[in-house]
Amino acid sequence: MTVALLLLMPYGLVGEAAHEWIGMGMFALFVAHHVLNRRWINAVPRGRYTPLRMVQTTLIGLIFLCMVGSMVSGIVLSRHVFAFLPKHGGYELAGKLHILCAFWGFVLMSLHLGMHWNMLLTMARKHLQPSKIRTW
């Protein structure tokens, strides 16, 4: 998801069609991410809410809103992937919403990634260290 997000940001460099297709890939990864994390989503109403948990839950809720805003506005603005859909106007609002959600989503996802950085490093170390099973 991080690579797709980074590829989506330089719109002028990747071009309109590639931007839309990468956006569709990001949507697929977004859905897969939530399917894989459904246990966490189901556990949101349960348990004790510490200040850290409140911050993380709020952050994830805001990211979700930004992603939905980016996706809906992206579909309205689409000229390639969703060209078959009828056009009803609202391009100016959709364009502003798309930019707003994209940039705030980038900031919020960076915070989200930063809050999980130690977990990512631990997983990477575990998979990159020599293992008795993988060595001769």
What positions do the PLM features span?
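Membrane-embedded alpha-helical bundles that constitute the cytochrome b-like, heme-associated redox core
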Residues: 1-136
